């Protein structure tokens, strides 16, 4: 089972709101998921990002692959740097 960390779209039409979720790569975008890691609201100025850092690092260390957008969000929050440092043993 390949696990991905990706965005699940919520909110009304033309007013998107996303949950950052851990899901099986075979499940649909807005379908079944394993766990919610955070939220992302691109409509708010500035864009609002809330991520549970512990959960995100746990899933990255377990082998979950983040989507491109989630990788960018994690990088802006400093999570990817912490993950790489932990992986290299620093």
Curated annotation (Swiss-Prot):
Q: Which UniProt keywords apply?
A: Ribonucleoprotein, Ribosomal protein
Q: Which GO terms describe its cellular component?
A: cytoplasm; small ribosomal subunit
UniProt keyword Lipid biosynthesis, yes or no: no
GO MF annotations in UniProt: structural constituent of ribosome
Spell out the InterPro entries in the cross-references. Ribosomal_bS16, Ribosomal_bS16_CS, Ribosomal_bS16_dom_sf
SUPFAM superfamilies this protein is in? Ribosomal protein S16 (SSF54565)
Q: Which domain of life is it from?
A: Bacteria
Q: Name one Pfam family in it.
A: Ribosomal_S16
BP term (GO), one: translation
* Family affiliation: Belongs to the bacterial ribosomal protein bS16 family.
Protein name, entry field: Small ribosomal subunit protein bS16
Organism annotation: Bacillus velezensis (strain DSM 23117 / BGSC 10A6 / LMG 26770 / FZB42) (Bacillus amyloliquefaciens subsp. plantarum)
């Amino acid at each position: 089972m390949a696990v991905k960390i990706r965005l699940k779209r919520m909110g009304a039409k033309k007013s998107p709101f996303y949950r950052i979720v851990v899901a099986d790569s075979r499940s649909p975008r807005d379908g079944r998921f394993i766990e919610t890691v955070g939220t992302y609201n691109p409509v708010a100025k500035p864009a609002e990002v809330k991520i549970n850092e512990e959960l995100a690092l746990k899933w990255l260390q377990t082998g979950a692959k983040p989507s491109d957008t989630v990788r960018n969000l994690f990088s802006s929050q400093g999570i990817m740097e912490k993950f790489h440092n932990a992986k290299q043993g620093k």
